[in-house]
Amino acid sequence: DSKADLLIYGMGEQPIIEVLKLLKKGVPFHSLRNIRQTAIIASEEEVAKIRAKGNFIDLSSHEVCLSDKKAFAANFKHIERESNKIDAQTLIQYHQGKAIVIFPPFPTMTEAQIDASFDLPYTRMPHPKYKNRGDIPAYEMIKFSVNMHRGCFGGCAFCTISAHQGKFVASRSKQSIVNEVKELTNHPEFKGYISDLGGP
């Protein structure tokens, strides 16, 4: 529905870095057609090339899933299985006659990669668009919370963390966590305690 040229799914640091590296090298944006952890609307020629490589799954179309619960469930099963693999397959699903191609995710981040992401100078403040909306209960709950890792193998029915962050756990280094805790103590609203040290 979005008609986007390229979508990045999940936690996007690795695909964003790859996209930016290629653009910096002068690769035209319209040529970015096979980057891991992205989705594109593909031509039939591109779909044929993907199928020729053999590492793909054809999902039931969106339209079929709207009228067939079993087809929808089968698609979900494929997505769940592929999200629990080190080397997942490419997924192909048709929607309104167009092929949506979802490339496999990047490998789980290394400690150095996840540290580089978490060590950026975040403001720890809500987006400015919320400025005049009063308190944000969820923000108040996590304001002084520290993530020690990303990913979850659980797949609980009430939670989508594994869909966003993957089922493989990537852990931060002790030093990265300690640095964040020290930074928290300088926050003007810090009251002397950390509400949570844990997962996503």
What residues fall within each predicted segment?
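Alpha-helical elements of the RecA-like P-loop NTPase motor core of helicases
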Residues: 17-18, 115, 157
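N-terminal [4Fe-4S]-dependent radical SAM core
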Residues: 77-145
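Glycine-rich beta-alpha loop elements in corrinoid/cobalamin-binding modules
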Residues: 1-96, 100-107
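Conserved phosphate-coordination/catalytic loops
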Residues: 10, 108, 171, 175
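Conserved Radical SAM active-site core
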Residues: 1, 123-124, 128-200
